[in-house]
């Protein structure tokens, strides 16, 4: 059995335990830092954030839909996929130098989160670039293909790998004082990912009150 089949079989076995999968609220991870919700004028100002939403992955052989929770900072990424009933399907805990993936009662480790996901699942998911795209930003290796009538980026192409990733920003929404994507689609060959951000919250260090010691 190849990596993709084994990965999706593990996920669907978890889903079967909790009944039919719907896309609803997400189970969140406990905070691991002293970050607090903040308001920003632009998503580029948010060095950390957390989101709750939906993820759908499609290949010619398989389809997967799950709830997504992601807490991102410059030092750490914590990502969880769950079913509607809160059953945890997958957790990923990554730093710039290490990654730990837990799925189906098994633990996998690597020095790179993107390499780890590809090794276990067979999918080349661009986990390193997603934090930029999720917030509607264009990376240094991204090429803008089209913009909408307001001049906002509509579609970009990233050619770090071949075939390239094509990212389409389907709709936008106001969150935490900034405008971020609501739905986006990622395509690379016959692999398609769809993301929906139901809630996006910018995070930052809490302000020090007058008279308090830092």
UniProtKB/Swiss-Prot annotation:
PROSITE patterns from the xrefs?
A: PROKAR_LIPOPROTEIN
Q: What SUPFAM superfamilies has UniProt attached to this entry?
A: Prokaryotic lipoproteins and lipoprotein localization factors
Q: What keywords appear on the UniProt entry?
A: Cell outer membrane, Chaperone, Lipoprotein, Membrane, Palmitate, Protein transport, Signal, Transport
User: What is the topology of this protein in the membrane according to its UniProt annotation?
Assistant: Lipid-anchor
**Please, where does N-palmitoyl cysteine lipid attachment map on the chain?**
26
| Subcellular location field | Cell outer membrane
A GO term from the CC aspect: cell outer membrane
Q: Which family does it belong to?
A: Belongs to the LolB family.
Family matches, as HAMAP family: LolB
Instruction: Give the quaternary structure.
Output: Monomer.
What does it do? Answer: Plays a critical role in the incorporation of lipoproteins in the outer membrane after they are released by the LolA protein.
Instruction: Kindly provide the name given to this protein in its UniProt entry.
Output: Outer-membrane lipoprotein LolB
């Amino acid at each position: 059995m190849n990596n993709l089949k084994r990965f999706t079989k593990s996920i669907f076995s978890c889903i079967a335990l909790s009944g039919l999968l719907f896309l609803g609220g997400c189970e969140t991870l406990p905070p691991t830092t002293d970050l607090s919700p903040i308001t920003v004028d632009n998503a580029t100002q948010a060095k950390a954030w957390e989101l709750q939403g939906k993820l759908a992955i499609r290949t010619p052989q398989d389809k997967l839909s799950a709830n997504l929770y992601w807490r991102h900072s410059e030092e750490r990424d914590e990502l969880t996929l769950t079913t509607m009933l809160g059953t945890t399907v997958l957790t990923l805990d990554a730093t710039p130098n290490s990654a730990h993936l837990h799925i189906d009662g098994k633990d996998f480790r690597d020095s790179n989160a993107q390499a780890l996901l590809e090794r276990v699942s067979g999918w080349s998911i661009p986990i390193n670039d997603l934090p930029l795209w999720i917030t509607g930003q264009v990376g240094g290796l991204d090429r803008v293909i089209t913009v909408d009538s307001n001049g906002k980026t509509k579609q970009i192409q990233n050619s770090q790998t071949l075939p390239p990733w094509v990212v389409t920003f389907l709709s936008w929404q106001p969150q935490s004082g900034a405008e971020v994507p609501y739905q986006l689609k990622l395509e690379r060959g016959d692999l398609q990912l769809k993301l929906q951000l139901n809630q996006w919250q910018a995070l930052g260090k809490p302000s020090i009150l007058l008279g308090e010691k830092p």
